């Protein structure tokens, strides 16, 4: 596999298991949310999610850096973004967390048109309840995954095997072998002679 295959197509094929792609997207969103917005907290806090948490994926949690309570919503769509589904989640968030939540990060694998009436209506609904909405969508999510290579490995099977990887691993192996490795020592075998026909050396 080529390096840098962090795409939504790769995400779907790499996460096609019994739980399904949507659950894996929720997991990815939770990890990005934690690394991006909670890692600077002085007190380590873990994201807690009740079964079928209403409106947002987990309970609101304090962002100590900005002194506000934040949450996140993960929306994975197969086709176009469904603004009605986003609105339903926003309504539940207002109902359950008004006065307890300052900002929702909306992770969505599709691009959202923030100037359309549907989105503006969702934003107004939340703003009227004192909750801001910050969309993190499509390629921005992929860029964040590239920032954390271990997430690329886990969710996109992007193991970073490249020419440089082979060169680095060979150098490490040579260093481990130390004086036991001698580049001048080379045994010519029947297999290497047969291969040299194809390699033209």
Task: Identify the residue ranges that each predicted region occupies.
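Mixed-charge (Asp/Glu-Lys/Arg
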Residues: 1-188, 194-201
């Amino acid at each position: 596999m080529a390096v840098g295959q962090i795409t939504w197509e790769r995400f779907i094929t790499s996460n096609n298991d019994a739980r399904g792609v949507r659950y894996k997207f929720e997991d990815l969103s939770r990890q990005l949310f934690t690394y991006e917005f909670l890692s600077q907290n002085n007190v380590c806090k873990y994201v807690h999610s009740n079964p079928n948490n209403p409106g947002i994926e987990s309970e609101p949690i304090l962002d100590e850096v900005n002194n506000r309570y934040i949450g996140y919503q993960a929306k994975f769509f197969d086709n176009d973004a469904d603004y009605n589904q986003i609105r339903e989640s926003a309504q539940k968030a207002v109902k359950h967390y008004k006065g307890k939540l300052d900002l929702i990060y909306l992770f969505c694998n599709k691009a959202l048109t923030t100037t359309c009436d549907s989105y503006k209506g969702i934003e107004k609904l939340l703003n009227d309840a004192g909750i801001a909405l910050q969309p993190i969508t499509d390629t921005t999510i992929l860029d964040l995954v590239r920032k954390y290579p271990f997430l690329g490995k886990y969710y996109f099977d992007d193991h970073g095997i490249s020419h440089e990887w082979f060169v680095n691993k060979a150098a490490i192996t040579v260093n481990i072998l130390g004086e036991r490795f001698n580049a001048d020592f080379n045994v010519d075998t029947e297999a290497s002679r047969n291969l040299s026909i194809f390699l033209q050396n």
